[in-house]
Amino acid sequence: MERYGSITTPVSVPRLIVGAMLAAGVAVLILAFTQYGLLAGLAVSVIPAALCILWVTLRNPAISMLGLFVVNYFIMALTRYAHDLPFGMILDALIFYNFLIITLQALIRPIEWKRASSGLTVVAAIWMAYCILEIVNPESVSVAGWFSSVRSIAFYFFFIVVLTQLTMTEYKYLKYMLAVWSVLTLIAVGKACMQKFFGFNAAENYWLFVLGGRSTHIIHSGVRYFSFFSDAANFGGSMGLSMVVFSISALYYRNSWMKLYLLLVAAAACYGMLISGTRSALAV
């Protein structure tokens, strides 16, 4: 009988190096927990995950863009539960990280920069320039207020347009994005259904009855549900866009099961749009 291994087989040098690195990592982790406390131990334990993320995103920057897409989807929910965290800075850091990944990739292999020279990029650049010029508007209240507004409606728009064209370079990435988007849509609708059938949680009640959200979301015609979005208008607009995108996407899929899935997601998004009670979603 042929044997596939033996305990007497010499261990290769790379395996010895990996084993030594793992042993050293465990030792450092134990030292951090025992000598410097829980926070230090958690910080050290995150380093391997961060290195893995760096390696994966360097190999495929599209994954980093999908991660940015997911974080951007949920970050509005986090603002309701933790008011003091700088969530805008988190998005800034993630966008900078994506540009850094693209720059590092350019050192290894050529990047098709011309992909970013599209009509959409020109439109985004014109819009950003217009918003920048608004700083000299005499009606502007403050530079800080101007920057806070322009950062989200102009800078993010331009940077995301450029990054998407540089990273999503293959058709398969569009499928990946639709798959991620569909899951996020179902989660958003599920959260709205929880609000409708089980009620609001403590943070949502605080926003409604203390911060004044009640005046626009609990009205004479009923309750406008907002899921984990900032308000019902954003939730309804997002669900309206999801309904349109997934309805159209279902027409182009040949796989019957995928076609059915996308139609169900579109139907769920339509339901979410309806219970949001926002009229602006109809414009989508």
Predicted features and spans:
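Membrane-interface helix caps and helix-loop-helix hairpins in membrane proteins
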Residues: 35-36, 81-85, 139-147, 274-275
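Hydrophobic alpha-helical membrane segments of integral membrane proteins
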Residues: 64-68, 144-147, 175, 279-284
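Transmembrane alpha-helical segments of multipass membrane enzymes and assembly factors
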Residues: 56, 60, 163-169, 192, ...
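Membrane-helix interfacial "entry" motifs
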Residues: 11, 111, 115, 140-149, ...
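Hydrophobic core segments of transmembrane alpha-helices in multi-pass, intramembrane catalytic enzymes
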Residues: 43-50, 72, 90-99, 148-161, ...
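Aromatic-anchored transmembrane helix interface
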Residues: 90-95, 119-129, 143-166, 179-180, ...
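Alpha-helical transmembrane segments of multi-pass inner-membrane proteins
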Residues: 2-6, 14-15, 23-25, 49-52, ...
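Transmembrane signal-anchor hairpin modules in multi-pass inner-membrane enzymes, especially those
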Residues: 1-133, 172-175, 179, 252-258
